[in-house]
């Protein structure tokens, strides 16, 4: 019998183009193989002679991590079989065509994600084996696979929460919500490598690389690592936070337009934190990383978000008799808004019923298991007050449900409760609507309707779990029991007379109506109303007052009085932060009793409007003319204007232009050509910043067709 010639591997075709398309990774490119777990991919192996299944034995070996181990799940050895044996590593469904072998490789839906090397060992009979490298591939989570913990059974939702590479962050104030376009860019060149670089620079990996890699099959673990690594409080994470006003050593958080530049800068500088970020930047960068790794993720904004460090579900704020909001040494705050992420996953570590959206917050606010990270906390657990469930559920519950107590301070002591608000925190919880540029309110996912029996019952349930059965008496409860919070003889409201624009005088209207109360059920009262205006900081604090005003009046029973107020531009011109937020507060003192009432109005100033127009049909590789128009509607010139354009699939990186000074009342028109590189829905984002206004921002949705398409 003639001896069969040795089987040698001549070449391998990883079929990256076909596989990447079938695994929804073609947007990352087709130069290398990028696949998702729990789904087969295909190879073509070319040999020196036809493969003979009865004589030739092929063993596949896949390895990832620094010390691959089958025990740790970072090394897999599997043989060529006719039928796929189940949710395990396998090579099956092969066909022989002359000297080539087409084979289907399957990775289990609980495999470790990461960069893999793939090789085969070929032997004949009892002879020795020869090893051949096949190449490398990247393995990601697979939300299209029903067996994966991140499975999301809706193609529409998958297109939004995995494939969409742009979106919106919602900022401002609950009554002045602004949409902030953001370029996630999760499919841009090198981003996938940077995502794994983030995992590899974590403290978990530095402490025990082999163990860390072995746990990357667990989406809960990976999410917590990423949450800690987006901030730099414990490690060389991606972003350094800055909530002050001096950004001279870096970039103002308001000037970032997308995640790509941040991630590329972090990687290029060897993992040195990028300066600077605030909550919406942290959350947007985490959204990029998680979508890139294959976890359905969205960015969520919570307006009037509590930062309740002492876990008593109460936030105290203080005013003096001149209506000035006072700073305090306490770390508890009410942020104008706060931004976090939601990731979709199964929670096998929790009792049944808590799967689905989970809160993850990369902004460094408090430690969790020794590191500055937060979550995943089940949104369902937050809604039901199940604050005993992991991870960090009490902190997130307080962010959307804490009570607010407003005190009048005198002689250094809290003298009077001005308000006890049970529904002022956790307002207009928002995310981008699926398939639309509109905002969607998801407040009902986090809490029952304010004031409903269910909402108060859940609040008491969470309070008992967080504070214990021997709940200490809170100071404001003592005052409530002693009658410290009574009905008031008048109702006060502050309204804006017209839309507030930065650079214009602000016109307000005070409305006061005399109503019956227990002390003075009828008859006139005298009021002294002291007003104060302060710059409102994103973190909930204020700066020194820049405007004061006092009104004295007599108010007859049953009558309503309107009093106009003028806040001149000259008063606030150089006093505001980049967010352009103003808090106008008033303390009305009743002359007959000495008791006080509070009225508040937060004002978000509108920046000038930016217009973006595209005149032609957009095609890949063809010049696309873009027109940008800005009219300076302010009373002052905009100096040192710069324009930056960004958009995945439209621009490689960014386009920056210096525009000089734009005189008050004048219009600036810019034309430029773009050359789209990718087909499909794209978004062009434009930011014009100046010394006076940092965030004149606009966007344009553009659908790019394949070149030559009808």
Curated annotation (Swiss-Prot):
Pfam families: Transglut_C, Transglut_core, Transglut_N. Its EC number is 2.3.2.13. It comes from Homo sapiens (Human). Widely expressed. Ca(2+) binds at residues 401, 403, 450, 455. Belongs to the transglutaminase superfamily. Transglutaminase family. It catalyses: L-glutaminyl-[protein] + L-lysyl-[protein] = [protein]-L-lysyl-N(6)-5-L-glutamyl-[protein] + NH4(+). InterPro entries: Ig-like_fold (IPR013783), Ig_E-set (IPR014756), Papain-like_cys_pep_sf (IPR038765), Transglutaminase (IPR050779), Transglutaminase-like (IPR002931), Transglutaminase-like_sf (IPR036985), Transglutaminase_animal (IPR023608), Transglutaminase_AS (IPR013808). Binds 1 Ca(2+) ion per subunit. The gene is TGM7. One of its GO terms (molecular function) is metal ion binding. This is Protein-glutamine gamma-glutamyltransferase Z. Gene3D superfamilies: Immunoglobulins, Transglutaminase-like.
